Amino acid sequence: SRMKAQDQKELMRERICDCAKRLFEREGYEQVSMRQIAAEAGIAVGNLTYYFSKKEDLLKERLNDIQETFSESIQLERGEISGKPFWEYENRTLLELLLRFLKAVEQFQKNAAIVYENYSRLQKTVPVFQEMSREWTEKIMTIYNGLIKQLWERRVFRKELEWDEYENLIYLIKLLTFFGQEMHGDQEYEKKRFTERICRLLIPYISWEWKDTYTVLCKEICEVSFHRMTLKFI
């Protein structure tokens, strides 16, 4: 019976989270009140606060779920993929991993749209979000950094360019990853997907011998094709 009560509690928790997710996506996080969430879940506000005392807690829960899904989908930890360090992978596999990672980030952005559309505002107004997003940004940037550095050291990326140039590139990727979504409604921006923008951004950094492999992988993994003339300039 205690197990049953525990299950029911868990089910109610999930139901509240689903209702909050729907409302946040439909109305926007700022607009939704705890009263609305309770009504949508068909419970009293007092019952709702038993599970979640503040609206922020619901956003945090949502973000936790999305982050877990993302982490599972890529199995990436600091400097390791599926338990193996970056340097144990072949060059081509590393390049593939970078592109697959971009795709996973794009999917994550879609799932977390409500968060990303309000990214800078939420960072200022929701303390718990500020903390989570800092850790999260760090985690994603560590992976970008690790993969790009490894590819640069192996000359898949142009080694004659100083590492400074790549730090600048990584900073641009960071802006597109975390703030690109805020440009919603900007027609020019929305003409291209996140992955396509990054694939194009990386082109001039790819060393000549890897150009063909890179373009093949971009097409296979990210469904991005380049004009022949563009490639002539690399």
PLM regions with names:
Residues 1-2:
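Short, Lys/Arg-enriched N-terminal segments with co-localized hydrophobic residues
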Residues 15, 19, 23-61:
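Helix-turn-helix
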Residues 61, 75-114, 170:
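Hydrophobic alpha-helical connector segments
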Residues 64-71:
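Short, basic, alpha-helical segments at the C-terminal edge of helix-turn-helix-like DNA-binding modules
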Residues 109-131, 145-146:
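Amphipathic alpha-helical segments used for helix-helix packing
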Residues 128-156, 164-175, 199-203:
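Amphipathic alpha-helical packing segments from all-alpha helical-bundle domains
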Residues 149-150, 182-234:
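C-terminal peripheral helix-coil segments that are non-catalytic and often amphipathic
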